[in-house]
Amino acid sequence: MTQLNQNSTLRDLSIYLSANGNEFILEKILASDYKSFVRALYGAIDKATLQLEGNTKHRSEDSEDRTTIEFCTALEMAGYSAKHDIQTGGHVDITVVSGKFSWLGEAKIFNAVTEMRSGYQQLTHRYANGAPDQAAGGMLAYIKRANASKHMATWRKVVENEFKVTTLDCADRPGLAFYSESASPSSGLTYCVRHMAVMLHYAPIV
């Protein structure tokens, strides 16, 4: 593994961070536009997701708020300003700010499509204004049932058919995440939402 010292280059730092699954940190530091900010943030969110999914025995009974606070804590540890329950047209579950860039996230325990539907409507029609520096957001689906990919596929069909928006595959979490794009009611600009499963199912047979 590459060791860092005062003579290390950006390439050395990149190799070091990648070896530890933290390559998003360098991208966050170097982000000069909103697209780069969001790409790095999703790297941090994916890592936080994997950490939570690796401890389902201890997380499966957690409340929605507690799981969301754990997400915010993980993002804070990655160097972001990530706050829970900030007032922005309502009580937003996750608000991430970096300089002039911001990202809003809505989190729901996905027991039924009803919860996801209300969360998506809150995010897109109440919280986010769709400005160029706030052009993306996220839906976190805490899934405590078996077959998370099936539930995400069901939700994706609802997004497409009921809300009449375009959806795109997510290469980083195939089957467990997807994107939707629609016109923001406030700005009229494209607002991109990343819908993400967090698998918290725990039902051992022995």
Predicted regions span which residues?
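Catalytic cores of nucleic-acid endonucleases
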Residues: 109-163
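Active-site beta-strand-loop-beta-strand hairpin of nuclease catalytic cores
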Residues: 95-104
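Interdomain/boundary linker segments immediately adjacent to catalytic/signaling cores
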Residues: 1-65
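A short acidic/basic microdomain associated with nuclease active sites
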Residues: 57, 61, 68-93
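Hydrophobic, Leu/Ile/Phe/Ala-enriched alpha-helical segments that form helix-helix packing faces
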Residues: 45-52, 71-79, 127-130, 155, ...
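Short, mixed charged/polar active-site loops
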Residues: 91, 102, 190-192
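Domain-level recognition of nuclease-like catalytic cores that cleave nucleotide substrates
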Residues: 142-206
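Short, flexible loop/turn elements at secondary-structure junctions
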Residues: 98, 108-111, 199
